[in-house]
Amino acid sequence: MKLTCMMIVAVLFLTAWTFVTAVPHSSNALENLYLKAHHEMNNPEDSELNKRCYDSGTSCNTGNQCCSGWCIFVCL
């Protein structure tokens, strides 16, 4: 009986601890999404959705041009 009560208290404590530590990270999540979406509406050229990348086999200069991120004279 005591072990069961201790287990229940431990689970409740860990659940509460999870919620307490998660609040600062999730409280601004919607606000950050709104600000990012608002910025992308004001600057559509800077939107991540407009970024182009090269398919494999296409010549490249740097890895950030390739969709895979790997560039050795051609996108891998």
From Swiss-Prot:
Disulfide-linked positions: C53-C67, C60-C71, C66-C75
Tissue-specificity statement: Expressed by the venom duct.
Pfam families: Conotoxin
Protein's UniProt name: Omega-conotoxin-like TeAr94
GO molecular function, one term: ion channel inhibitor activity
Statement: the UniProt record of this protein carries the keyword Secreted: yes
GO CC term, one of those recorded: host cell presynaptic membrane
Keywords per UniProt: Cleavage on pair of basic residues, Disulfide bond, Knottin, Neurotoxin, Presynaptic neurotoxin, Secreted, Signal, Toxin
Region forming the signal peptide: 1-22
UniProt xrefs under InterPro entries: Conotoxin, Conotoxin_omega-typ_CS
Domain notes: The presence of a 'disulfide through disulfide knot' structurally defines this protein as a knottin. The cysteine framework is VI/VII (C-C-CC-C-C).
Subcellular location as annotated: Secreted
